[in-house]
Amino acid sequence: MDNQNIRIRLKAYDHRVLDNSTKEIVNTAKRTGARVRGPIPLPTHIERFTVNRSPHVDKKSREQFEIRTHRRLLDIVEPTPQTVDALMKLDLAAGVDVEIKL
C-alpha cells in the first residue's frame, strides 16, 4: 500500500483491557514490518449522573455515579499487505471498541 496510514482509535471502560489490546495491535504491526506511531493516550471522557438516594423525600441526599471512557490512538505508517491481513485476523478482548480509518 503506497503512502497510506491506518488510524486506529480504541475506546474502553477498563484501561487495563485497553492497554493490553493496544500492545497486541502494536506487536502485530511491528512483526509484519510496519512502523507504528503511538499509542497516544487521549483525554478520558467522564460522564457523571446524580440521583436522589431516596425515592420519596430528602432532596439534599444525593448519590453520584460516573462512567469513565478511556481512549487511545494508534497510527500505522506504511502498512504492508501482511499487516492488513494480520490486523483483520486479530481477535481483541471484549469491551474494546475499535474504529479504523484509512
UniProtKB/Swiss-Prot annotation:
Keyword Ribonucleoprotein: yes
An individual GO BP term: translation
Family per similarity comment: Belongs to the universal ribosomal protein uS10 family.
Function of the molecule: Involved in the binding of tRNA to the ribosomes.
UniProt keyword annotation of Magnesium present: no
Pfam families according to UniProt: Ribosomal_S10 (PF00338)
Organism: Granulibacter bethesdensis (strain ATCC BAA-1260 / CGDNIH1)
An MF annotation (GO) of this entry: tRNA binding
Subunit structure: Part of the 30S ribosomal subunit.
NCBIfam families in UniProt: PRK00596.1, rpsJ_bact
InterPro entries in the record: Ribosomal_uS10, Ribosomal_uS10_CS, Ribosomal_uS10_dom, Ribosomal_uS10_dom_sf
Keywords linked to the UniProt accession: Ribonucleoprotein, Ribosomal protein
Protein name (database record): Small ribosomal subunit protein uS10
One GO cellular component, as annotated: ribonucleoprotein complex
